[in-house]
Structure formats: C-alpha cells, structure tokens
From Swiss-Prot:
Lineage, broadest ranks: Bacteria, Bacillati, Actinomycetota, Actinomycetes, Kitasatosporales
Full protein name: Elongation factor Ts
GO MF terms held by the record: translation elongation factor activity
Function statement: Associates with the EF-Tu.GDP complex and induces the exchange of GDP to GTP. It remains bound to the aminoacyl-tRNA.EF-Tu.GTP complex up to the GTP hydrolysis stage on the ribosome.
PROSITE patterns: EF_TS_1, EF_TS_2
Principal localisation: cytoplasm
Gene Ontology BP annotations: translational elongation
Originating species: Streptomyces coelicolor (strain ATCC BAA-471 / A3(2) / M145)
Amino acid sequence: MANYTAADVKKLRELTGAGMMDCKKALDEAEGNVEKAVEALRIKGQKGVAKREGRSAENGAVVSIIADDNTSGVLVELKCETDFVAKGEKFQNVATAIAEHVAKAAPADLEALLASEIEPGKTVQAYVDEANANLGEKIVLDRFAQFSGGFVTAYMHRTMPDLPPQIGVLVELDKPNAEIAKGVAQHIAAFAPKYLSKEDVPAEVVESERRVAEETTRAEGKPEAALPKIVEGRLNGFFKDATLLGQPYALDNKKSVQKVLEEAGVSLKRFSRIKVGI
C-alpha cells in the first residue's frame, strides 16, 4: 500500500474537487505522490469530459450581476444534466464566478468569453471543463447577455423553490425608473415576447406570417375583396402577441407595454430573456 496520510487525501480533494475514493485510488497509483495524483485525476477528468460530450444538459441556472449604480448588468446561463447538480453550491458558485467575470471582462461574444482568462493561466473554457470533471456531469456555457449605458436591472424567476433561478430577464431603460423596469422585466419573464417592437421583426418572418394569414383566410372561404383587410388585421394580431411593446401589460392589461412606458416617460432600449435549456 502506498505511503500517504489523511491530510494528503484532504489536500488532493481540495486541489481537484474529486471524491474521496477517487483521491485514494489516485494516491495508491501514484505511490503517495500528490503531484502525480493530481495529474492522474486531471487526465481522468478530461476523459470523463470527452465521454459526457454526447449527453444532454437541460438543467442548470441563470445568474445575474447588476452594477450598484444600475448602469450595467449581465445574465449568464450555465447548464448541467440534473437538477441535483443544479441545486448544489459548487455548481452555483461556478455560475456566479463566470457571471462576475463577464461583468468585469465585457467579452464581445461567446467565443471571446470562453477564450478569456477567468484566473491567471486558466480560460473560461478550461474553468468549465474543470467543473465538468469535478461535478461528474456535462457542464455547458453557451449563452450570456450584457447591457450597459442606460438604466439596467434584472428579474430572476424560480420555477421551483429548491432550484436556482431558471428564468432571467435583463432590461435597459433610457433613464432610471426602478418600478417600471421591474414590472416590465416581470412581464417579459411571464409572456416571453420574441421581439421588442414591430420594427424588430425580421422581414422574412413578416412575409411568412402574411402568407399563412392569406392561405388561412382563403381556406375559410372569405371574399377575395375582403382579403387584404382581414390579412392586415391578422398580421397586426401577430405583432401584438409577438412584440413586447404591443402586448397588454401584465400588471394592467387595459394598457399596452408601450403605453405604460410612454406614461412613465421612459423608453425600453433592449431586453434579454434566458430560460434554462430553451
């Protein structure tokens, strides 16, 4: 039997995050040499990462970081395979660390984020791979949002009380109004609008909706002369449902979101809604 102590096992667990039995086995194979055991566990961990690549990661958490003065904010989605891991402190600490890094580093896109150093000599991609190995599940970072310049706030929604937030919303107003920002963010969490305004809907989507409306109207046997007016009405209905500004406001459905913003004297510059796995 290799010569090592309980303190060596503890040290190895702290260095690698591996389980006790894995650490003991690694120390046995390394004949008590902690450095060699660390290397062996890292190699084993990377092999485990490769094996998990084909598996699905549909659980996880959304984390937000908002500047104290509300001039900037981020949302980060980190996914895992099971809700058991998602509930765990280690997984949530990893997600929070990445969100804090995004807030400081302001990466241009996901590729830049993964390539950036979260710790000296360690990229975010390596950090995620390390979490993958330590937690024993596929861990995926493939989405984040970052706003700055206006009044930024977030709303986080838990779908289950024992899980971390599964839905996160980031909103940016042109001027401070915490009450309106919170209300609109809650509305977005609940109603999941696809676009901010009618002008933001891609032309190809509008044309597709128009074709569907025309075909549906003809199939209903409506008079050809009435077709343009009916189609336009249905298209306006689509805009009302799909755009945030067109939707009835969740906290006062007699008014549209646009009307609520106008009455408050603010405009919504942009928003992002992230739901884990979707």
